[in-house]
Amino acid sequence: TYADLKLPCSSVVKKAFEELDVKVQAAYKEGYEGMASLDQELLFQWTGRMVYGLLYYEMLYERDRLLRQGEDFELSADLRERFGRFHLMLQSLIEPISFIGKKPWTIAVFPLKYSADIFSYRDDAINLMFSFGVNGFGFIACLQDNGVIGEKQKEILDKMEGHVLHPIQFEELYARFHYSDYILQYKPKYKIETQDHGIVVEAETAGKQPLFGFWDEDIFAQL
């Protein structure tokens, strides 16, 4: 179960995440208003911790599976770069790392109408995506898209503002984010500099613009 998942970490990291959990728990008790008031960097760190943990276990599972078959486990250069940047950004929890300009993520928080016994959770660790919904609120996070998917879905996000989502609407919205990520032909790039006060991460917006492939309604309907 998820409760059994544990990751190796230093005492400094453990303490930092415990302090983060206290902040999120306090916001959680206030429902949508509390979660929506949280700084998005805190939500990035909180969701990122879970996605990173799942990614860690997925990599261990795949490594062990291949070793049993006498094969080597290797990540592609693109995945090594993606996960390396993600790990660097997560260290903003304990290190002086700041994000300037456009944020590396898209995070949408909204009121959600679920019955008290329903809990919705989805993740795509490889693509660094996450969704979470309970009675009162839900949120969807794309943790390394440079805000591109949020811009793609801006029209529908604007229409949602001020409305409480039905569970089916929540599932459809996550499907929209997930499919947008699938057809996105874009590799996020960053300017990362070490300065006197710490590390600065800036999303590069010049150069090749994001391009989305053909939106196939039949495939979208299956998500």
Please give the residue ranges for each predicted region.
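Short, Lys/Arg-enriched charge-dense amphipathic segments
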Residues: 41-53, 61-65, 84-93, 195-197
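Domain-level detector of nuclease and nuclease-like folds
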Residues: 26-27, 32, 68, 139
